[in-house]
A protein has these predicted regions:
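Metal/cofactor-centered catalytic core regions of large enzymes
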Residues: 1-143
């Protein structure tokens, strides 16, 4: 569970989104732990529509939490392959995944009743001054 309200940056999902293989990447702009912008073709338009639909059906207190960065993880299984199977995709070695939406099962405050996961094939992941993953290679090296 990412620390709520703390994540900032750009996430480019280029593997699969919610178990669907992507032909073009979907870009999420995250500020203070919330997705504030989505771009990248027809799949991103579908995602925006889905999130708008969720916003119209949740409690008023949860509307701002629909875009919560709910999960972030790394794939570590060298035998897994990107296939469109959501559970396998998120564990491919060198990949990373994010989930947006509900994080209540992990103790978070976003209770919006849905979660969408996206997989990045060869990401670069930085945490302050440490490169955790460089172009899909697990490094955990200080810059």
């Amino acid at each position: 569970l990412p620390k709520e309200g703390s994540a900032n940056g750009k996430i480019v999902i280029d593997g699969s989104l919610d178990g669907e293989m992507l032909d073009e990447p979907v870009t999420l702009l995250v500020e203070e732990g919330n997705v504030i912008e989505i771009s990248g073709g027809s799949v991103s338009e579908d995602l925006i529509s889905k999130m708008d639909s969720i916003r119209s059906s949740v409690k008023i207190s949860q509307i701002d939490k629909v875009g919560t960065l709910a999960e972030f993880g790394f794939g570590m299984n060298p035998r897994s392959r990107l296939s469109g199977n959501q559970l396998e995709d998120q564990v491919v070695r060198g990949s990373s995944y994010v989930a947006i939406g509900d994080n209540s099962s992990l103790g978070g405050s976003s209770r919006v009743g849905y979660q969408i996961r996206g997989v990045m094939i060869k990401p670069t992941v930085e945490l302050e001054d440490v490169d955790l993953v460089l172009e899909g290679k697990v490094t955990a090296r200080k810059r």
